From Swiss-Prot:
The lineage of its organism: Bacteria, Pseudomonadati, Pseudomonadota, Betaproteobacteria, Nitrosomonadales. It catalyses: thiocyanate + H2O + 2 H(+) = carbonyl sulfide + NH4(+). The keyword tRNA processing does not apply. The modification Cysteine sulfinic acid (-SO2H) is found at residue 131. Its cofactor is Co(3+). This is Thiocyanate hydrolase subunit gamma. Co(3+) binds at residues 128, 131-133. Its EC number is 3.5.5.8.
Length: 243
């Protein structure tokens, strides 16, 4: 699924932070209700849920960052990542079947992982328009803004504008391709290796591959090793659009 739309629309140019998340997702409310019902019906216990929750909160983006760093250094491994993301994940310690406490994954997490390789003329960015599908075993918990209806609705319609709000201004000749995650397929982005990193080790490279880079709303830069504190700001140079 791809989108690359530029339209005309007047925007306020004040530069105050504009938090994207001001809504409670209906799916979060639904999750709590379904979870309580499942425990009541004996499908799993509250202890099972606690163990799973503890496991999920140990996850982070480091395995995905290492996957990208390794691919930057090894063309054959990069090829494997693009062809079979699930198999490539094993090299960074993630087995999508046996890593979760259940030892058989879950319908939510055991699925096809696709690694989307950027190029100088193509930028990928990931969203889940239906709910909040996210490759947790390799990327950890999704950020709150990723789950917000605001991000999910707008990215598909105005990807260039939304990326600009994240501070990522892309030249007009760069195509933006939006990948829509779903129950069966999850995505991570393999950004272009930045200039100024020649001779870097895998560990050094992995440090600059942040979670936001792996979702596609940022690009790696030497010296930048953390996500922006406020993920969404008003763009300094907004991309105008019509409705």
């Amino acid at each position: 699924m791809s989108a690359d739309h530029d339209h005309d629309h007047d925007h306020d140019h004040d530069h105050k932070p504009a938090p994207m998340v001001e809504e409670v997702s209906d799916f979060e409310i639904l999750e709590m209700a379904v979870r309580e019902l499942a425990i009541e019906k004996g499908l799993f216990s509250a202890e099972d849920h606690r163990v799973w929750k503890d496991y999920v909160h140990t996850l982070g983006p480091l395995p995905a960052a290492r996957l990208v760093a390794k691919a930057w250094l090894d063309p054959e491994y990069k090829k494997l990542c693009i062809e079979d993301g699930v198999e490539a994940s094993k090299a960074v310690g993630v087995n999508w079947v046996t890593s979760p406490p259940t030892q058989f994954g879950t319908p939510s997490d055991y699925c096809n992982l696709r690694v989307l390789a950027d190029s100088p003329t193509l930028k990928h960015v990931v969203v889940c328009t239906l709910c909040s599908c996210y490759p947790r075993p390799i990327l950890g918990q999704s950020p709150e803004w990723y789950r917000s209806p605001n991000y999910r609705r707008r990215l598909v319609r105005w990807p260039r504008q939304v990326l600009a709000e994240f501070g990522l201004q892309l030249p007009s000749e760069v195509q933006i391709r939006v990948a829509d995650s779903n129950q069966k397929t999850r995505y991570i982005v393999m950004p272009v290796r930045p200039e100024g990193t020649d001779g870097w080790t895998e560990d050094q490279l992995a440090e600059i591959v942040t979670r936001d880079c792996l979702i596609g709303v940022a690009v790696p830069k030497p010296g930048i090793t953390v996500n922006a504190k406020r993920p969404v700001l008003k763009a300094n140079r907004p991309v105008h659009h019509d409705h």
